[in-house]
Swiss-Prot record:
UniProt name for this protein: Capsid protein
A Pfam family it matches: Cucumo_coat
Keywords carried by this UniProt record: Acetylation, Capsid protein, Ribonucleoprotein, RNA-binding, T=3 icosahedral capsid protein, Viral nucleoprotein, Virion
Family: Belongs to the cucumovirus capsid protein family.
Taxon lineage: Viruses, Riboviria, Orthornavirae, Kitrinoviricota, Alsuviricetes
Length: 218
């Protein structure tokens, strides 16, 4: 055998696959794989419910519809005598109203009682004619006609009544941001005079995203 044949035979011997089989996986490896799968499933579950810029949390409990965000405004009613009424039109910031053709899907009102609250109030939101002066007589008639849902909020010893919010769905009406000035929050103080330091109303307006919505709403 010449030198070239010897070299070739050596190479062939080196290319032979190594005999034998891998050792069986240890129980630690199996446990690690199971744990990894569980963590992966958990992460997917958490990610599905996690708010994002495009799908923020609506009032901390329900996610906005895809492609929507929301703008919040706070109303603090003045003193309302027993059996009297208060109304305030929805006035959004200029940075939002300049996109007046963006659709509005829902309005949510949350009642936040302050420590001195000890009354019963009725709260609703209504579309109000531009000519309306939101007088006591006009607001009283709107509460009486049953044309929109009414939240009855009563004093609770715990400080917060379990049902402290309601949704007003505008999807079928094709309302837009420009229409919001036609809507008003109405309050009726039923059993007692409502003082200025007893109640705060948070109004959350869910609307199509606008270019200025670069961060999650607070």
């Amino acid at each position: 055998m010449d030198k070239s044949e010897s070299t070739s035979a050596g190479r062939n011997r080196r290319r032979r696959p190594r005999r034998g089989s891998r050792s069986a996986p240890s129980s630690a490896d199996a446990n690690f794989r199971v744990l990894s799968q569980q963590l992966s499933r958990l992460n997917k579950t958490l990610a599905a419910g996690r708010p994002t810029i495009n799908h923020p949390t609506f009032v901390g409990s329900e996610r906005c519809r895809p492609g929507y965000t929301f703008t919040s405004i706070t109303l603090k009613p003045p003193k309302i005598d027993r059996g009297s009424y208060y109304g305030k039109r929805l006035l959004l910031p200029d940075s939002v109203t300049e996109y007046d053709k963006k659709l509005v899907s829902r309005i949510q009102i949350r009642v936040n009682p302050l420590p001195k609250f000890d009354s019963t109030v009725w709260v609703t939101v209504r579309k109000v004619p531009a000519s309306s002066d939101l007088s006591v007589a006009a607001i009283s008639a709107m509460f009486a006609d049953g044309a929109s849902p009414v939240l009855v909020y009563q004093y609770a010893a715990s400080g917060v009544q379990a049902n402290n919010k309601f949704l007003y769905d505008l999807s079928a009406m094709r309302a837009d941001i420009g229409d919001m000035r036609k809507y008003a929050v109405l309050v009726y103080s039923k059993d007692d005079a409502l003082e200025t330091d007893e109640l705060v109303l948070h109004v959350d307006i869910e609307h199509q995203r606008i270019p200025t919505s670069g961060v999650l709403p607070v």
